[in-house]
C-alpha cells in the first residue's frame, strides 16, 4: 500500500517560519548595509573620539535617570491607586495606559506650552511677580518628557503586581496589626521586587532608544544621544560611514538591553485568593492624605500638557490652518500608513503565535520561544537604526524613493510587533487550553480553525493589538525623519517642520488634530468587535 508523502515543513509551521524569515532577513539586510558602510580601517580613531564617548555616556546617563525617576515614584503611586476608589479612577488608569502610545511630538508640544519660557507656568509666575527660570530644554527637559511617558506605565504595571497579592495575606497582616512600613516590607515588597527590575529595564531601554524627545528637547551638543547623532550624521553632515558606525554601536547596546530585559522579565503567577481586592478597613487619615496628594500630583503631571494641546490648538489660526491642503495631505498619509502598518503587524504577529502555539502543544518549548523571540528581535534595532540601514541600502543600490510609503509602513509594522505579541500572547494560549482538544476531536485545523475559533474568540485582543499598532505608527517620527520631504510628510513630520520654523500657532492646531486623530482611531478600532464582546 502506497504511503502518503509527508511535506518537508508541516503546514502549521509555515506561517511562523515565514514571518521569522522575513523579520530576520530584514534585520540582517539592515545590519549588512550598516556594516558595509561603516569605516573598516578607522575604528581606532572612532574609539578615541571624545565626543562619541560623551554621546554614549549621555545616552546611558539620561536613560538611567529617566528609569530611576519613573520607577521610584511609581511604587508609591501604584500603592495609592490600589488603596483608593474615586470617581474617574478607571479613566486615570486608561490614561496611564495611553501615554505609552501618545505621539511624542504632541506630548512635547504640550510640555513646552506648560513649562516653556512663554508657557502657562511662566505666565503664572510673571503675574505673581516671580521669575520662571526652568528651561524645558537639555537634560532636565528630556527627563521631564520621559517621566511624563513612563511614570504612568510603570505605575500601571506595578499596580498589577499589587492586585495579584492574595486577599488572605492582606487580611492576615491586618489581623496581626501590620501597618505602614512593616506592611510594605513583609506583604507588598516581595511582590513588587519581582516586577520592578523588568519594568526598570523596559523603561531604560525605551529611554535609551528615544529619538523624537531628544531631537525636540535636547538643546545642543551637550544633550545628544546616539540616535540623534545618527540623524545628524545623515541629515546635516551626510556622513554615511559615521552614521553606519553609530547605528552599529546603538544596535549592540540595544541588543544587550533586550537580552537583559528578557532575562529579568519573569511571569508573576497570580495569587490564589477568595478575597480578590480586599482592602484594610482600618484606613488612617495620614494614609488617605498622602495617597490623595500622590494622585493629585500625578494628575498635575499628566493633564496640563494634554489640556495645553487642546486649549492652544483652538486659536485664531484654526480656520486658516484647516484650509491648508498640505495639512490634509499629511493627515491622509499618516492614516493610510498607520492602517496598513497595523494590519501587517497583526498578521505577522498571528503567524508567529500560531506556529509557536503548535510547537508548544507538541512539547517543543525551545523552538516556540525562538519563534516568539524573533518578534522581539526588532527591539534590538530601534526605528532610526532600521531606517538608517534601509537608507544606506537604497542609496547604494536603486536610489532613495520620492515616496517612502512602503518603507515606513514595513518598518512601523515591525516596530509594533513586540507590543502586539504582548497583547495577543496570553489570549492565544488561553484559547489553546480551552479549545485544542475539541478542535482535534472534530478535525478542525488550519484555515478552518483560524476562521471558526481564533478570529471569533480573539476579537477583542485583535482589535486592541491593531489599535496599539496603528496609533504607534501614526505617531512615529523616527523613521519618517530620514525619508520625509515636501512631497512625503506625515502629521508628526509636518508638526516638526512647524515647530522648527517657529509657527507655534499653526503647530498647536496640527498637534490638536494629531491628538484627536489618535484618540478617535484607537477608540473606533477598539469598538470594532461590538458591544457584546466581553471586556476587562
From Swiss-Prot:
Keyword rRNA-binding: no
SUPFAM superfamilies: MetI-like
Superkingdom: Bacteria
Pfam families, A to Z: BPD_transp_1
Record-level GO cellular component terms: ATP-binding cassette (ABC) transporter complex, substrate-binding subunit-containing; membrane; plasma membrane
Chain's role: Part of the ABC transporter complex ThiBPQ involved in thiamine import. Probably responsible for the translocation of the substrate across the membrane.
PANTHER family: MOLYBDENUM TRANSPORT SYSTEM PERMEASE PROTEIN MODB (PTHR30183), THIAMINE TRANSPORT SYSTEM PERMEASE PROTEIN THIP (PTHR30183:SF9)
Name recorded for this polypeptide: Thiamine transport system permease protein ThiP
Gene: thiP
Amino acid at each position: 500500500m502506497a504511503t502518503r508523502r509527508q511535506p518537508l515543513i508541516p503546514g502549521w509551521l509555515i506561517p511562523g517560519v515565514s514571518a521569522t524569515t522575513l523579520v530576520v532577513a530584514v534585520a540582517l539586510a539592515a545590519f549588512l548595509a550598516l556594516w558595509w558602510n561603516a569605516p573598516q580601517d578607522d575604528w581606532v580613531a572612532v574609539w578615541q573620539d571624545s565626543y562619541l564617548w560623551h554621546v554614549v555616556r549621555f545616552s546611558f546617563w539620561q536613560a538611567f535617570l529617566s528609569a530611576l525617576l519613573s520607577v521610584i515614584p511609581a511604587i508609591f503611586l501604584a500603592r495609592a491607586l490600589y488603596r483608593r476608589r474615586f470617581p474617574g479612577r478607571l479613566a486615570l488608569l486608561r490614561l496611564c495606559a495611553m501615554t505609552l502610545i501618545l505621539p511624542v511630538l504632541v506630548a512635547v508640544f504640550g510640555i513646552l506650552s506648560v513649562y516653556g519660557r512663554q508657557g502657562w507656568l511662566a505666565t503664572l509666575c510673571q503675574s505673581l511677580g516671580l521669575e520662571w527660570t526652568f528651561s524645558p530644554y537639555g537634560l532636565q527637559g528630556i527627563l521631564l518628557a520621559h517621566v511624563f511617558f513612563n511614570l504612568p506605565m510603570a505605575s500601571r504595571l506595578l499596580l498589577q503586581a499589587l492586585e495579584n497579592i492574595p486577599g488572605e495575606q492582606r487580611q492576615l497582616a491586618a489581623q496581626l496589626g501590620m501597618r505602614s512600613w512593616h506592611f510594605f516590607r513583609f506583604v507588598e515588597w516581595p511582590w513588587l521586587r519581582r516586577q520592578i527590575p523588568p519594568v526598570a529595564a523596559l523603561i531604560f531601554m525605551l529611554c535609551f532608544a528615544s529619538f523624537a524627545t531628544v531631537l525636540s528637547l535636547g538643546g545642543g551638543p551637550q544633550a545628544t544621544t546616539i540616535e540623534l547623532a545618527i540623524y545628524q550624521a545623515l541629515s546635516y553632515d551626510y556622513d554615511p560611514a559615521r552614521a553606519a558606525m553609530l547605528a552599529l554601536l546603538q544596535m549592540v547596546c540595544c541588543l544587550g538591553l533586550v537580552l537583559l530585559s528578557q532575562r529579568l522579565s519573569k511571569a508573576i503567577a497570580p495569587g490564589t485568593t477568595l478575597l480578590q481586592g480586599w482592602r484594610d478597613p482600618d484606613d488612617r487619615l495620614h494614609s488617605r492624605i498622602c495617597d490623595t496628594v500622590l494622585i493629585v500630583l500625578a494628575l498635575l503631571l499628566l493633564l496640563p500638557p494634554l489640556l495645553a494641546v487642546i486649549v492652544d490648538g483652538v486659536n485664531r489660526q484654526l480656520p486658516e490652518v484647516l484650509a491648508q491642503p498640505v495639512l490634509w495631505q499629511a493627515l491622509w498619509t499618516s492614516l493610510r500608513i498607520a492602517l496598513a502598518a497595523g494590519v501587517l503587524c497583526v498578521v505577522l504577529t498571528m503567524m508567529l503565535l500560531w506556529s509557536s502555539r503548535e510547537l508548544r502543544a507538541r512539547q517543543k518549548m525551545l523552538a516556540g520561544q525562538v519563534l516568539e523571540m524573533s518578534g522581539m528581535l526588532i527591539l534590538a534595532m530601534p526605528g532610526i537604526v532600521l531606517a538608517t540601514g534601509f537608507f544606506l541600502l537604497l542609496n547604494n543600490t536603486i536610489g532613495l524613493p520620492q515616496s517612502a510609503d512602503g518603507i515606513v509602513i514595513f518598518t512601523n509594522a515591525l516596530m509594533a510587533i513586540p507590543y502586539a505579541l504582548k497583547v495577543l500572547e496570553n489570549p492565544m494560549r488561553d484559547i489553546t487550553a480551552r479549545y485544542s482538544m475539541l478542535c482535534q476531536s472534530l478535525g478542525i485545523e488550519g484555515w478552518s480553525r483560524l476562521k471558526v475559533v481564533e478570529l471569533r474568540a480573539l476579537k477583542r485582543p485583535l482589535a486592541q493589538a491593531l489599535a496599539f499598532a496603528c496609533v504607534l505608527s501614526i505617531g512615529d517620527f523616527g523613521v519618517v525623519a530620514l525619508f520625509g520631504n515636501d512631497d512625503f510628510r506625515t502629521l508628526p513630520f509636518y508638526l516638526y517642520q512647524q515647530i522648527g520654523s517657529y509657527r507655534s500657532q499653526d503647530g498647536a492646531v496640527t498637534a490638536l488634530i494629531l491628538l484627536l486623530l489618535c484618540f478617535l482611531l484607537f477608540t473606533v478600532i477598539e469598538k470594532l468587535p461590538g458591544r457584546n464582546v466581553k471586556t476587562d
